[in-house]
Amino acid sequence: MSQFVLEIGFEELPSRFLPGLERELAERFARALDDDGVEHESIRVLTTPRRAAVLIEGINPVQREAEEVVPGPPVRVAFDAEGKPTKAAEGFARTQGVDMADIFTLSTDKGEYIAVRKRTGGANAADLIATACPTVVAALPFPKRMRWGSGDFTFGRPLRWLLALFDDAVVPFEVGGVVSGGVTWGHRIHGAGPLVVKSADDYLNVVIEKGGVTPDPAERRAMILAGGNAAAEAAGGRILWKESLLDEVQGLAEHPVPLLGDIDPSFLELPREVLLTSMESHQKSFGVEGPDGALLPHFLTVLNLTPLDVALVKKGWERVLRARLEDGRFFWKTDLAASFDAWLAELDNVIFLGPLGSMGDKTRRLEKLCAWLAKAAGVADESACARAGRLSKADLVSEMVGEFDTLQGIMGGIYARRMGEPETVAAALAEQYLPAGPDSPVPATLAGALLSIADKADTMAGCFGLGMIPTGAADPYALRRCALGIARIVLEHGLRIDVRELFRTALALYGERAWKLAPAEALVKLEEFFMARLKNHFMAAGHETLLVEAALAADTPEGAGIDVRAAGARLAALSDFSRRDDFGSAVLTFKRAANIIRKQGQEGGAVLDGAYSHALLAEDAEKALAARLEEVAPRFDALWAADDFASLFGLLGELRPAVDAFFDGVMVMCDDAAVRTNRLNLLKALTLRLGRLADFGALQM
């Protein structure tokens, strides 16, 4: 078996480009080899800031062979009455490059045709790979592409070299004016090169040993972790590893060397969040904490070389970080000399979103919406929630958030504590932007949860009123994330909030605006959008699609609104019910009842309200069903009020035998109109309760 290596050398790519580049190279080469019939055992992709290497092992040097039957014209056209080949047959043979002796008759459902067997494959795998390489490289996608020189070729960064070897032979091709060869380049300082690679098998040894490069991202990550942990342990602490930053720094170095530096202990007076953000965002460095969880006066950075003078390099990093921390201290002291009142006044000069007014307007709306939410959720301290809404965006005009925008909300909470606001308010301000994504936690405090809901609902209502509704992948105001965040917060906090009324109130608080959508229309679209996100959330949690659709389509009582908590509990109970052995037969029974009522309402024109007359109940089975319904009804209503959906589905099990007996022994659509309507109303009384739990008609069994 053979080996192949392709190394694409380029100027430093941003670290965030590398994971996608690895994935695309692996997928595109796998697809190209499969399409060409080149058998192989494995494909491995390694990336650094300056190179991407594709290593393919276990290659069959010869393309997979196969036999193909190529049909030609019908036999009646291919031969004349005397059985001699016609021009059609001769032309077919000539086109296929065979003699007439190679032609045979192929019988098909459509008749007999002449045909020829042709063997395909058997080509040199190296030649096929040489053809695939320029196509794959040129088509690689990047978040941003650039052009250099006088050509039109674009790539993530300028190409500098191409190494391509099939075993010990160069695979010749050209991309963007760069011709492939058998030469690579190492680390700029520890093994620049040029370095000759004699074979694909020798590639890693040359790059690592002679080039001073660690090409494997996982190995670089492990080196950073091991070196950083050892250095911190020697200083009596531990590194505060941030996964996203760790991923970034391993993609910034070909030769990673962790270095522990020191900071002036006086900077520890700054808030922990300020120190860490300054280290991480500006210097790509990690903080260090002691056994008690307090920050230590150290930081860890990652170099891209082994320094000759460690002390000198360390001193340089400390000097640069000190300047950053001095800026942070200045922002901190300046902000502490300000006040929330001053910041709130400044918010009136900060635009929220076009026609939707200023950030000051938004905070006044949030003050009222938080108070409404607190009352709806039964929170005792409505005033604290309202105060949190009013102060929620004040830190946006602070010096610190102006420099570190990722600290929005967090600094609001810190400043609230320093300026004497209640802890409830401070915690809410710090948590208002949670959850930041599908894997981010929701606010831990109830006040924070309500402020986050209010903020998201206000943004959604304003955008929908302006017709800014997400389409396709475009969602510039992250409205999908807002909707998902509201759903998660309500579910995880178990809040009983009518989301329809939430959006209605949020729209109303804007007052008179130059809306593109009337409030009533915007409300309908908001509901549809929110329910679609809720459905996606439940499916992502592992619930079956049909069960989710059935639970969300339940016919809740008029005026019930959108109760997300109840929907989640209803779906969980339905999912449990679906695991019962008799689930399928139960669904068929209840679905039959639902379908009869739906059909009579849509096609028969019957107006059914569930009120039936005992005097018209003639059959034993219908009397038994009526009695069972009346016995179960008070229990159903009590369980419904308690949101005990598991027990409600248990009641369905109790009802089912009576329903089955009804269908077995009673002719619903009888000739007597009065009796027929009475029986339909009996079924309507059943489905009025069934429909609250799920749309059984939507379930396919």
Curated annotation (Swiss-Prot):
Keywords: Aminoacyl-tRNA synthetase, ATP-binding, Cytoplasm, Ligase, Nucleotide-binding, Protein biosynthesis. GO terms for biological process: arginyl-tRNA aminoacylation; glycyl-tRNA aminoacylation. Pfam families: DALR_1 (PF05746), tRNA_synt_2f (PF02092). It comes from the Bacteria. The keyword Transferase does not apply. InterPro entries: DALR_anticod-bd, Gly-tRNA-synth_bsu, Gly-tRNA-synth_heterodimer. GO terms for molecular function: arginine-tRNA ligase activity; ATP binding; glycine-tRNA ligase activity. GO terms for cellular component: cytosol. The keyword rRNA processing does not apply. It is found in: Cytoplasm. It catalyses: tRNA(Gly) + glycine + ATP = glycyl-tRNA(Gly) + AMP + diphosphate. Its main location: cytoplasm. Its EC number is 6.1.1.14. Coiled coil: none annotated. Tetramer of two alpha and two beta subunits. Belongs to the class-II aminoacyl-tRNA synthetase family. PANTHER family: GLYCINE--TRNA LIGASE, CHLOROPLASTIC_MITOCHONDRIAL 2 (PTHR30075:SF2), GLYCYL-TRNA SYNTHETASE (PTHR30075). This is Glycine--tRNA ligase beta subunit. It comes from Nitratidesulfovibrio vulgaris (strain DSM 19637 / Miyazaki F).
